[in-house]
C-alpha cells in the first residue's frame, strides 16, 4: 500500500523518512527540473540588483515562477494520485497540502488520547470514521484545571462508548502478556472478555516463575517525600529496593542469556522525581552497565503504547493518611500493569494503597 506522510519530517523516525511528503517530492522525476528553475530564479534575483534592464529580468523571473508553480502542482497531483493512505496527526490534517481533499475513510489511532476538538479537524474531510483506542487507558493531557472541569478531557471516543455502545467493538484476543498478568485487567476493566492468545498464554522467562510479584514495602521504612508540583513525589528507599530487585532478577536469568536474548526491562513510576532518581541509581551502579540499552525508565504516561519482557512498578505513595493522589485514576494503573509480557513486579506500601478499592 502506497503511504504518504504529511507533517514535520524532523519528527519522523528514520525508518519512515522515505514515506514523507518532502522525500517523495524530492524523489519525483520532475523535481530536478523544478530545482533548476528555482536556482535560475535565485540567480536572476542576484543579477537584478546591479542590472540596468531590471524590468526584463523581472519578467523572466515571473515566467519562471509560473513554470515552477505548474511543476509543483503536477508533482503534488502525482503524489496524491499514487498514495492510497495519507498519514498525519490530527492537527496536521489542516495542512495546506490537504486543502480541498476528500477521503472515504478516516482512521484515528489512539483515539482515547485525542482531544475531541482535534478530531473534528480531519472528520470534516471524510465520509466515514473509525476510532481505534482504549478509553480504559490514559486520556489526553489537559493541564488547565478550568478546561478540564469544562469537559475538555472528555474524548470523542468516550462520548461514543457512552451514547452509542452498539457501534463499539472490543478486540478480545491479546498477543502481549502472560494470562496471569492479563487476568486482573481483563476482569476489572473489560468484563472478563479479553483472552490471551495460545502462544502467549503461559509465556515466561524462568521455569516455574510467578508472572506477578507484589513486594510490600510497609515494614521497610519506605517513606514518600513531596518535591514540588512539577516532579511530584519521591520514595528513595523504594527506588533503591526496586533497583535491588531488578539486579536480583537479572542475576537469576543469567548475564549471558539476558544479553543474548535481549530481554528488555521497563522501570515505571507515576512520578517524575522517582523516575529521575531511578535513572541516577542505574547510572551509578556498574552492575547495570552491560544492560543499560535494554532498560528503560519512564513515567506511566511515557510508557503508554509500549511493552517490555519485564516490568517493575514503583508506586511511591506511603503515608499514614492513605493518600494515593492520581494513583486513584484507574486508567493510569491499567496502563502500568499491562506493559509486561512475561514478568510484572510491583513495589508499594500495602497499608497506604489498600485504602482505595482498586
Show which residues each predicted segment covers.
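Conserved helicase NTPase catalytic core signature
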Residues: 17-104
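Conserved helicase motor core of SF1/SF2 NTP-dependent helicases
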Residues: 6-10, 14, 20, 30, ...
Amino acid at each position: 500500500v502506497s503511504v504518504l506522510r504529511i507533517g514535520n519530517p524532523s519528527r519522523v523516525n528514520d525508518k519512515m523518512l522515505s514515506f514523507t511528503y518532502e522525500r517523495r517530492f524530492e524523489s519525483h522525476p520532475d523535481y530536478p527540473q523544478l530545482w533548476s528553475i528555482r536556482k535560475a530564479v535565485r540567480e536572476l534575483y542576484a543579477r537584478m540588483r546591479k542590472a540596468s534592464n531590471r524590468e526584463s529580468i523581472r519578467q523572466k523571473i515571473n515566467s519562471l515562477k509560473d513554470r515552477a508553480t505548474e511543476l509543483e502542482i503536477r508533482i503534488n497531483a502525482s503524489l496524491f494520485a499514487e498514495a492510497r493512505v495519507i498519514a498525519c496527526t490530527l492537527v496536521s490534517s489542516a495542512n495546506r497540502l490537504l486543502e480541498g481533499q476528500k477521503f472515504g475513510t478516516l482512521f484515528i489511532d489512539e483515539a482515547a488520547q485525542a482531544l475531541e476538538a482535534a478530531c473534528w479537524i480531519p472528520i470534516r474531510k471524510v465520509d466515514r470514521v473509525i476510532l481505534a483506542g482504549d478509553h480504559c487507558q490514559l486520556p489526553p493531557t489537559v493541564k488547565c484545571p478550568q478546561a478540564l472541569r469544562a469537559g475538555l478531557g472528555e474524548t470523542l471516543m468516550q462520548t461514543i462508548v457512552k451514547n452509542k455502545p452498539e457501534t463499539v467493538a472490543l478486540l478480545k484476543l491479546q498477543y502481549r502478556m502472560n494470562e496471569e498478568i492479563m487476568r486482573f485487567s481483563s476482569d476489572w476493566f473489560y468484563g472478563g472478555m479479553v483472552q490471551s492468545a495460545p502462544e502467549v498464554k503461559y509465556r515466561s522467562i524462568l521455569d516455574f516463575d510467578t508472572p506477578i510479584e507484589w513486594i510490600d514495602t510497609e515494614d521497610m521504612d519506605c517513606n514518600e517525600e513531596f518535591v514540588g508540583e512539577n516532579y511530584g513525589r519521591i520514595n528513595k528507599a523504594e527506588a533503591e529496593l526496586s533497583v535491588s530487585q531488578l539486579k536480583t532478577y537479572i542475576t537469576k536469568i543469567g548475564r549471558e542469556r539476558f544479553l543474548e536474548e535481549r530481554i528488555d526491562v521497563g522501570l515505571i513510576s507515576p512520578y517524575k522525581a522517582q523516575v529521575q532518581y531511578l535513572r541516577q541509581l542505574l547510572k551509578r551502579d556498574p552492575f547495570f552497565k552491560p544492560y543499560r540499552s535494554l532498560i528503560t525508565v519512564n513515567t506511566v504516561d511515557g510508557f503508554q503504547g509500549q511493552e517490555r519482557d519485564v516490568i517493575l512498578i514503583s508506586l511511591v505513595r506511603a503515608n499514614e493518611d492513605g493518600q494515593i493522589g492520581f494513583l486513584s485514576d484507574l486508567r493510569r494503573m491499567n496502563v502500568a500493569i499491562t506493559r509486561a509480557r512475561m514478568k510484572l513486579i510491583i513495589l508499594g506500601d500495602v497499608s497506604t494503597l489498600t485504602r482505595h478499592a482498586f
